[in-house]
Amino acid sequence: MAMPDSRLRSGIALANLRAMPTLAIVFGLILEAMGIGAYFLSGAQSVTALIPSFFGSVILLSGVVGLLIPKARMHVMHVAALVGLLGTLGGLGMGLPKISGLIAGTLERPTAVIMQIAMGVVCLVFLALCVKSFVDARILKKYSK
């Protein structure tokens, strides 16, 4: 497999380095908004409604640090990916088993289940983008030698 010329490679590498911290900030803000929205819209105002915000805060902070401190970018993006993995497992792991009750309308707190599934899906998309970025970075590193 031949890689494009070095100018294109360096452009791709530069775009890749800037893209993941920016995506982390965007996904962090989405999770923050989900948690705050669930907290105020659910009526119960339980601290557990803020769980997406907790995940979002770590991902958002990782993105900001990744942009501001280039030498730490790889490490903080791996932290963000780990948080994305935990959010995926927690959100989908807790929400999907309750989906039949959600469809049947028998759940006591349907908003909580919807938010669990939504958080899991958002974290899954973020995690997939992280994995793609890590693979792209490894390929670029391999061909830049």
Predicted regions and their residues:
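Cytosolic juxtamembrane helix and N-cap/initiation of the first transmembrane helix
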Residues: 2-28
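Transmembrane alpha-helix entry/boundary detector in multi-pass membrane proteins
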Residues: 17-23, 27, 34-57
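Residues within membrane-spanning alpha-helices of integral membrane proteins
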Residues: 21, 25-28, 49, 56, ...
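Canonical alpha-helical transmembrane segments
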Residues: 57-71
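Mid-chain, well-packed structural core segment of small domains
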Residues: 71-106
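Individual transmembrane alpha-helices with interfacial aromatic-anchor signatures
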Residues: 107-128, 132
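Cytosolic juxtamembrane helix at the C-terminal end of the final transmembrane segment
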Residues: 130-145
